[in-house]
Amino acid sequence: MRDKLFYFLSKYNFSPRDKIGQNFLIMRDVIIKAVETSEIKKSDVVLEVGPGFGFLTDELSKRAGKVYAIELDKRIIEILENEYNWENVEIIQGDAVKIEWPEFNKVVSNIPYQISSPFTFKLLKHDFEKAVVMYQLEFAKRMVAKPGDRNYSRLSLMVNALANAKIVMKIGRGAFYPKPKVDSALVLIVPKPKDERIELNENLVKALFQHRRKLVSKALKESCHMLGINKKELKTLKNILENVPHAKKRVFELTPEEVKEIEEFLKIQGIIN
């Protein structure tokens, strides 16, 4: 794959753009691991974000019924259309974070790392069976962190509320060209059954995790502006915020269930909708 990559770079006089996260996956073992982990069948419709030079896309096309590949760089799209004759791959030009996604049931992607957070939050709002996504290793660790872990964050909470995530494979920098400055990891994301998912108020979660090391009551008071509470209102609501469920817990120790209890309490008090 390295030889094929350099052939494309030379043939099309192509220079990767670091600004849009163009680090191309060139290790076949990693590509096969991603495809096998996703357990793709002919009945599957797969979404890929950032197809690059089509090495992963080509494997997906052999196994899936349909592949949608979203690519921002028009130069890449021109190369893919020239070099491959896929009948079941539809390339969509655009920013994956901003455009509407087609319907799919599986995701397999080596995404640009700078869109990791908005991509993941957008993904979790969709119905799908399984996603296998390449992330920066440190981001992946935050995704799979549990309450109380040093990596536990807003991301950890939101992922844990809606899905089960685990690191499938850690990947060194040599698996990409150009080499990124960070290590990577393949992450498997499987949505929880609908009756087990916990839909959380995103503004509340953001407000809490602005101060993840602080006590819940203090975090809410210090982030009250994010909940639409001004300083004058805070004086009258101070006692309520000090008596929310789990007020004396630190934010990074909260489970999704506990955040939901805080949310329901604040709704009853008329503080949030």
UniProtKB/Swiss-Prot annotation:
SMART domains: rADc. This is Probable ribosomal RNA small subunit methyltransferase A. It holds the Pfam family RrnaAD. It is found in: Cytoplasm. Signal peptide: none annotated. The keyword Methyltransferase applies. S-adenosyl-L-methionine binds at N23, L25, G50, E71, D95, N110. One of its GO terms (cellular component) is cytoplasm. Belongs to the class I-like SAM-binding methyltransferase superfamily. rRNA adenine N(6)-methyltransferase family. RsmA subfamily. Specifically dimethylates two adjacent adenosines in the loop of a conserved hairpin near the 3'-end of 16S rRNA in the 30S particle. May play a critical role in biogenesis of 30S subunits. Its EC number is 2.1.1.-. One of its GO terms (molecular function) is RNA binding. InterPro entries: KsgA/Erm, rRNA_Ade_diMease-like_C, rRNA_Ade_Mease_Trfase_CS, rRNA_Ade_methylase_Trfase_N, rRNA_adenine_dimethylase, SAM-dependent_MTases_sf. It comes from the Archaea. NCBIfam families: ksgA. Keywords: Cytoplasm, Methyltransferase, RNA-binding, rRNA processing, S-adenosyl-L-methionine, Transferase. The keyword Methyltransferase applies.
